[in-house]
């Protein structure tokens, strides 16, 4: 490809509304252009990269026997009402009404559509297992689209769905898809971690997320420094560092705390160690009209996913209002605690092991100090309620936990019979009786992968593509292309490289574009290999080669360039 025949749309300045590196560089490198908030046009340079990601995903899906299909992007509300997700999904679901007043949505995912397809096309266990996938545009009405392709309202996704006669068969396919996902991200040259995850609104049982490691990631991922244990922050089990509760050494006392509405104020005002304080968070209970208290240590954060999964707690989690607190307890949020609390409590595991600690007295501006379990109050229900923190013991007993930032690029789920039961998706089993199909679903954020790769591979000059993902493998830059010798040598090499199967971008912009600008553009775009053709080099029988990751160029004999490149470019 010649730049004279290509839309080379590089920009020198960084757009003011682009915060993360991938968004900045994709705009500057001419890969995408913003149409509206969360909506982007893929330009030729970016689309070449996107298609390469799609090709690798497609190859790995085909390799595990998945069948490619293409489902409608617009889905009827009736299917979502059958599954129960029409009301559950919330405002992120883009809804519309046609001229006949029928309700539809723009699909953020396709569980309902594929289940409808399966119940109409499958009738016997002999047709199972079956795994079908598509690569398609999805839609989500994000409240605050941000970070370019990281969190947009329209995105490209590969979603696959498998159907099985039983959970044992589902597990086999799930394991194969887990390996296929690892193959995809390994082939793309990404540093990634698969982690245990929560199923969220998709539903079902077990799941894993695949995260590209990057400081700009929105997710915290947790892993052990002594084993293969890894989970996202929502799923990671919090194990107390303490082995047992220390003996009581203080007397219980009621203390006036007029200026201590927060844990920080309590710690600062009374010289308490923060690990000797607790937070009492009152939420709506599963029983309508009731409240329940969740209690964690003062230096810990409530894990809302874990909390909402407690049998006695309403899901989704709803915090009690100040008015509800006053009505039920008679005190405000800054003065609550488990001692004499007229509500049921669930305490975190680490709270159970505390002694001589401080709690709100359920009286405004008062706290109890020197509180101890069993002496002053009974131990209530104990559960894992908090986020892990770095240094916690690994749940598998091997090593301690570390936390890094990650960008979620893939998620696989064992759905079980959640959708097949709701939508009556059955086949006749071996015994001739109807069987609800066990399902798996498997997603890769194809367009997000492109952005994640840039977050992981860039420098002050631009993107650093590997040979697998680069829009072009080689930038061929002639200096003074208008001269006969340079033009002849450049055109000959271009023909040889393209005939050998290399993807080459020949920068044939005229002399008004300086060599410095050409070099800077190719560095910005991130093309991994650069060859420069010049009068001076040709006079010496050489061309100049430079890798995107090397600081200094090297001279290569004209006769050796093709074999040299064949040895450098990974294909």
Swiss-Prot record:
One of its GO terms (cellular component) is cytosol. The keyword Nucleotide-binding applies. GO terms for biological process: prolyl-tRNA aminoacylation. Its EC number is 6.1.1.15. Keywords: Aminoacyl-tRNA synthetase, ATP-binding, Cytoplasm, Ligase, Nucleotide-binding, Protein biosynthesis. Signal peptide: none annotated. The keyword Transmembrane helix does not apply. GO terms for molecular function: aminoacyl-tRNA deacylase activity; ATP binding; proline-tRNA ligase activity. It is found in: Cytoplasm. InterPro entries: aa-tRNA-synt_IIb, aa-tRNA-synth_II, aa-tRNA-synth_II/BPL/LPL, Anticodon-bd, Anticodon-bd_dom_sf, Pro-tRNA-ligase_IIa, Pro-tRNA-synth_IIa_bac-type, Pro-tRNA-Synthase_IIa_type1. It catalyses: tRNA(Pro) + L-proline + ATP = L-prolyl-tRNA(Pro) + AMP + diphosphate. It comes from the Bacteria. Homodimer. Consists of three domains: the N-terminal catalytic domain, the editing domain and the C-terminal anticodon-binding domain. Belongs to the class-II aminoacyl-tRNA synthetase family. ProS type 1 subfamily. HAMAP family: Pro_tRNA_synth_type1. Catalyzes the attachment of proline to tRNA(Pro) in a two-step reaction: proline is first activated by ATP to form Pro-AMP and then transferred to the acceptor end of tRNA(Pro). As ProRS can inadvertently accommodate and process non-cognate amino acids such as alanine and cysteine, to avoid such errors it has two additional distinct editing activities against alanine. One activity is designated as 'pretransfer' editing and involves the tRNA(Pro)-independent hydrolysis of activated Ala-AMP. This is Proline--tRNA ligase.
């Amino acid at each position: 490809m010649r730049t004279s025949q290509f839309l080379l749309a590089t920009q020198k300045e960084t757009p003011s509304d682009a915060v993360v590196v991938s968004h900045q560089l994709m705009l500057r490198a001419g890969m995408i252009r913003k149409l509206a908030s969360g909506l982007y046009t893929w330009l030729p340079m970016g689309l070449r990269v996107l298609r390469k990601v799609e090709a690798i995903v497609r190859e790995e899906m085909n390799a595990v026997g998945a069948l490619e299909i293409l489902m409608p992007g617009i889905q009827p509300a009736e299917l979502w009402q059958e599954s129960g997700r029409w009301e559950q999904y919330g405002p992120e679901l883009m809804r519309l009404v046609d001229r006949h007043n029928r309700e539809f949505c723009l699909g953020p995912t396709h569980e309902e559509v594929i289940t409808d397809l399966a119940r109409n096309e499958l009738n016997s266990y002999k047709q199972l297992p079956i795994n079908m996938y598509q690569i398609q545009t999805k839609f989500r009405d994000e409240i605050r689209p941000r970070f370019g392709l990281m969190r947009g309202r329209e995105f490209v996704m590969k979603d696959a769905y498998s159907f099985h006669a039983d959970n044992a068969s589902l597990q086999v396919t799930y394991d194969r898809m887990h390996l296929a996902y690892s193959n995809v991200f390994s082939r793309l040259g990404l540093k990634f971690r698969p982690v245990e995850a929560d199923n969220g609104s998709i539903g079902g049982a077990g799941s894993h997320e695949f995260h590209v490691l990057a400081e700009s990631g929105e997710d915290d991922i947790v892993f052990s420094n002594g084993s293969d244990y890894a989970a996202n922050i929502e799923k990671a089990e919090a194990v107390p560092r303490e082995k047992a509760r220390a003996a009581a050494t203080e007397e219980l006392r009621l203390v006036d705390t007029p200026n201590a509405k927060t844990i920080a104020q309590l710690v600062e005002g009374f010289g308490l160690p923060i690990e000797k304080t607790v937070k009492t968070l009152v939420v709506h209970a599963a029983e309508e009209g009731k409240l329940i208290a969740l209690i964690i240590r003062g230096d810990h954060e409530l894990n809302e996913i874990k909390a909402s999964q407690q049998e006695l707690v309403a899901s989704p989690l709803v915090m009690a209002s100040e008015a509800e607190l006053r009505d039920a307890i008679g005190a405000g949020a800054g003065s609550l605690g488990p001692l004499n609390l007229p509500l049921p409590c669930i305490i975190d595991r680490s709270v159970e092991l505390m002694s001589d600690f401080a709690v709100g007295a359920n009286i405004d501006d008062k706290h109890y100090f020197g509180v101890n379990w069993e002496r002053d109050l009974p131990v209530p229900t104990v559960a894992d309620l908090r986020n892990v923190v770095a240094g916690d013991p690994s749940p598998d007993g091997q090593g301690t936990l570390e936390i890094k930032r990650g960008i979620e690029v893939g998620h696989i789920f064992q759905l079980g019979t959640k959708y097949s039961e709701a939508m009556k998706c059955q086949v006749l089993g071996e015994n001739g009786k109807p069987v609800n199909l066990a399902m798996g679903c498997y997603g890769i954020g194809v367009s997000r992968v492109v952005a994640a790769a840039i977050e992981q591979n860039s420098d002050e000059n631009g993107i650093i593509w590997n040979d697998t993902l680069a829009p072009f493998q080689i930038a061929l830059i002639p200096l003074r292309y208008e001269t006969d010798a340079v033009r002849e040598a450049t055109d000959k090499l271009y023909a040889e490289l393209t005939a050998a199967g290399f993807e080459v971008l020949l920068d044939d912009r005229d002399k008004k574009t300086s060599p410095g600008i050409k070099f800077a553009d190719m560095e910005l775009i991130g093309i991994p290999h650069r060859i420069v053709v010049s009068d001076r080099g040709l006079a010496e029988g050489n061309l100049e080669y430079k890798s995107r990751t090397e600081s200094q160029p090297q001279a290569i004999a004209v006769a050796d360039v093709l074999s040299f490149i064949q040895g450098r470019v990974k294909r």
